[in-house]
């Protein structure tokens, strides 16, 4: 207990000059570290924000857009977005892996639309696979037509 009271009040052994000397380097170090941290944060285009997923390969914005189109009053929690994001990543990874196996089995080095369609059919059962294939084909046609229209302008 004696040490706590000695730490709380200034001791008689140290003078006010010694206290100032010991405090000055701390203040100098803190201002130097603040300047260094500001210099590190500022890049070429100023400070940048890092969102929850800095990698940029998240589907979170698309989930919210689709939900807004389908059910306007609803929202998604972060946990729900995280679960859905991992689900989509997993399915796309499985489709790519299966399409790669199909391309290797036909002795090709390029994954084409045919391998992708067959991978979707193999991975998704029954009607779900057929629906996914038709929706994927429609999406590809839609983007192709849009690209052609943009070239004509």
Curated annotation (Swiss-Prot):
User: Which stretches of sequence are listed as region Disordered?
Assistant: 1-54
Question: What are the TM regions of this chain, as residue ranges?
Answer: none
Keywords assigned by UniProt, alphabetized: Chromosome, DNA-binding, Membrane, Nucleosome core, Nucleus, Telomere
Q: Say which domain of life the source belongs to.
A: Eukaryota
Q: Which GO terms describe its molecular function?
A: DNA binding; protein heterodimerization activity; structural constituent of chromatin
Compositionally biased tracts (Polar residues): 11-36
- Which residue windows does the record flag with biased composition (Basic residues)? 37-52
Q: Where in the cell is it found?
A: Nucleus membrane; Chromosome; Chromosome, Telomere
Q: Which InterPro entries would you find in this protein's record?
A: Histone-fold, Histone_H2A/H2B/H3, Histone_H2B
Sorted alphabetically, which Pfam families does this protein's record hold? Histone (PF00125)
GO CC, one annotated term: nuclear membrane
Assembly behavior: Can replace the conventional histone H2B in the nucleosome. The nucleosome is a histone octamer containing two molecules each of H2A, H2B, H3 and H4 assembled in one H3-H4 heterotetramer and two H2A-H2B heterodimers. The octamer wraps approximately 147 bp of DNA.
Q: What does this protein do?
A: Atypical histone H2B that can form nucleosomes structurally and dynamically indistinguishable from those containing conventional H2B. Nucleosomes wrap and compact DNA into chromatin, limiting DNA accessibility to the cellular machineries which require DNA as a template. Histones thereby play a central role in transcription regulation, DNA repair, DNA replication and chromosomal stability. DNA accessibility is regulated via a complex set of post-translational modifications of histones, also called histone code, and nucleosome remodeling.
Record-stated family:
Belongs to the histone H2B family.
UniProt miscellaneous comment: In contrast to other H2B histones, it does not contain the conserved residue in C-terminus that is the target of monoubiquitination.
Q: What is this protein called?
A: Histone H2B type W-T
Q: Which organism is it from?
A: Homo sapiens
């Amino acid at each position: 207990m004696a040490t706590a009271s000695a730490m709380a009040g200034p001791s008689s052994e140290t003078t006010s000059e010694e206290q100032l000397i010991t405090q000055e380097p701390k203040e100098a170090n803190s201002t130097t570290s603040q300047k260094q941290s500001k210099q590190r944060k500022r890049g070429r285009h100023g400070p940048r924000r890092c969102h929850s997923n800095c990698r940029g390969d998240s589907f979170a914005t698309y989930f919210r857009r689709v939900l807004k189109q389908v059910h306007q009053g609803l929202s998604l929690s972060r946990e729900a977005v995280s679960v859905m994001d991992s689900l989509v990543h997993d399915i796309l990874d499985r489709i790519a892996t299966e399409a790669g196996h199909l391309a290797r089995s036909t002795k090709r080095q390029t994954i084409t639309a045919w391998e992708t369609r067959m991978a979707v059919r193999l991975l998704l059962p029954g009607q779900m696979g057929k629906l996914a294939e038709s929706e994927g084909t429609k999406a590809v046609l839609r983007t192709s037509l849009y690209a052609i229209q943009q070239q004509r302008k």
